[in-house]
């Protein structure tokens, strides 16, 4: 059963056609990796899945993006509700630096009106455990989130994202600023999170895509200034070992990109 489905998706920034005719399905409780050279549109597609690209003036989408069969761009759909259901973890960890670790985790819940202190504490612990961070921070929950290491901050942001109980988690190069040990911790976490969430990750690290994902989507573009496009989508093992498209094979083998 597909959790997400993109039908003939075209993305524009004003007059610029950024991404052309993307069709893909994302199965529930799986990890899908988006790979491809810089400028190919993979992060643009990712951000369109929870309407984050709309914060840029002039950006718009043609086609359908379906979550459980419902178009998230439908006329009666609230973008804020979409972002609660489809969470996002960014490339650079972005905790609220002066806010306590606990308050960082429950910031989204508080914003949506939750005031029950007992529930907030329970959700904070549950989410920190879910992000494999609880044991490292349980004795300093009142300390600022900005005081954590880079890897811990990224896991704190993941805890904050899952605290509002999304159904889908989008990750835009979540390990690009992390050291190898912290990267491994986040990758292990991704494997655990897919038991509960549907995950889509953009990564420039081909080995990471091979390690963490169930299926891989390879994006490319004909030339600078041309729209990005989805070249090939398939099971990760097949994409990396026996792709159907020569362009995919050339990228995977390092002959371009």
From Swiss-Prot:
Disulfides per UniProt: none
GO cellular component, one term: plasma membrane
Gene Ontology molecular function, alphabetical: ATP binding; ATP hydrolysis activity; ATPase-coupled phosphate ion transmembrane transporter activity
Substrates-to-products reaction catalysed: phosphate(out) + ATP + H2O = ADP + 2 phosphate(in) + H(+)
Ranges of residues in domain ABC transporter: 4-252
Localization, UniProt: Cell membrane
Pfam family membership, one: ABC_tran
Keywords, alphabetical: ATP-binding, Cell membrane, Membrane, Nucleotide-binding, Phosphate transport, Translocase, Transport
Domain of life: Bacteria
UniProt record, GO biological process: phosphate ion transmembrane transport
Top-level EC class as recorded in UniProt: translocase
Family, per entry: Belongs to the ABC transporter superfamily. Phosphate importer (TC 3.A.1.7) family.
Function statement: Part of the ABC transporter complex PstSACB involved in phosphate import. Responsible for energy coupling to the transport system.
Quaternary state and interactors: The complex is composed of two ATP-binding proteins (PstB), two transmembrane proteins (PstC and PstA) and a solute-binding protein (PstS).
NCBIfam families: 3a0107s01c2 (TIGR00972)
Protein name: Phosphate import ATP-binding protein PstB
Taxon lineage: Bacteria, Bacillati, Actinomycetota, Actinomycetes, Mycobacteriales
Gene from which this protein is expressed: pstB
């Amino acid at each position: 059963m597909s959790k997400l489905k993109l039908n003939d998706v075209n993305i524009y920034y004003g007059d610029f056609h950024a991404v052309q005719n993307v069709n893909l399905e994302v199965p529930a409780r799986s990890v899908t990796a988006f790979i491809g050279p810089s400028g190919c549109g993979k992060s643009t597609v990712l951000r369109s899945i929870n309407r984050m690209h709309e914060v840029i003036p002039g950006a718009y989408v043609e086609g359908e993006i379906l979550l459980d069969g419902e178009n998230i761009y439908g006329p009666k759909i609230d973008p804020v509700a979409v972002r609660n259901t489809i969470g996002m973890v960014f490339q650079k960890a972005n905790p609220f630096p002066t806010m306590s670790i606990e308050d960082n985790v429950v910031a989204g819940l508080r914003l949506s009106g939750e005031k029950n202190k007992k529930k907030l504490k329970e959700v904070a612990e549950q989410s920190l455990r879910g992000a494999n961070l609880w044991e490292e921070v349980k004795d300093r929950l009142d300390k600022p989130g900005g005081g954590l290491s880079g890897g811990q901050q990224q896991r704190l942001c993941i805890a904050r994202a899952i605290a509002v109980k999304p159904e889908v988690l989008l990750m835009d190069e979540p390990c690009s600023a992390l050291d190898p040990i912290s990267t491994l911790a986040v990758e292990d976490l991704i494997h655990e999170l897919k038991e509960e969430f549907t995950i889509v990750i953009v990564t420039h690290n081909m080995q990471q895509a091979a390690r963490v994902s169930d299926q891989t989507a390879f994006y490319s573009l004909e030339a600078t200034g041309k729209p990005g496009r989805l070249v090939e989508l398939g099971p990760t093992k097949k994409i990396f070992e026996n792709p159907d498209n020569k362009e995919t094979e050339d990228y995977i083998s390092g002959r371009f990109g």
